[in-house]
Amino acid sequence: MAADVLCFGEVLWDVLPTGKLLGGAPFNVSFHLQQAGIDSKVISQIGNDPLGGEIRAAFDKWNIPTDYLFMHPSLPTSQVTVELDEQGKATYVIHQPVAWDEIQIPNLQELDINVFVFGSLACRSPKTRETVLACKAKAAYTVFDINLRTPFFSKERIDELAFDVDFVKMNDEELELIADWHFPGEEGIEIQMKALSAHFGWKTCLVTCGADGAYVLENGEIHFVSSVPVKVADTIGSGDAFLAGFLAAKLKRYSGEKCLQKATALAAFITSRKGAIHEHAGSVELDLD
């Protein structure tokens, strides 16, 4: 499997009481993959406005390729209002319509896609969803990052996206909800993971449980790893870091259990700092190289 990864979806500004931070799950995942030495690019869209200009400048600052960072002529750059509780757990108000609601790729038929990472949020709009499905059909390997943000999801929408996928990542609350849609009465994380993986045909199912650790199901085997105790600054982007850490290790052909350990270390690193984006390339502590 080639280690060239395209991460599709939202690039945005997380707006907190203390200021704004660059984010969006696909961008966060791509950033951490690059920091771990994986060749990764973002497919997204910004507005023709000052906030979009700041995003492009940030990409340039971090040497992030802008090959597929498109500009919409009229829709604005995305902003998300973030609220943090006393434990640093984030909740989001996601405004619409924004530039990434209408992502289209010129000459898509000529694009070669090795690993395609996409999320459920960007699929809230028909135009972007159509582009996702076209990319998904072309990809050699697909990664579906489930982020259920009310009111931007439905059973029908998630089912449409979840079939013909190799690797799925979600949290324990999302697992419980989706399992209840298809297998009401089935209880327990491991039972639900196995049932959904068999139903949809997933090869890898990754479930994060916050401070309670994480599970992965691969090749019929389930592995669990405890979380790394840290002082939580906030939880913004922690799940994205986890996915990136796991995928980076998987592309380097580590075992599922080892991938979990590396993912947990990166998620803890991000959770202990404010915001989703922090450089860690070459970190001996994280050992992602």
Predicted regions located by residue number:
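Ribokinase/PfkB-type carbohydrate-kinase core domain
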Residues: 1-6, 58-60, 66-69, 86-221, ...
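Substrate-binding N-lobe of the ribokinase-like
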Residues: 5-7, 14-80, 84-89, 94-100, ...
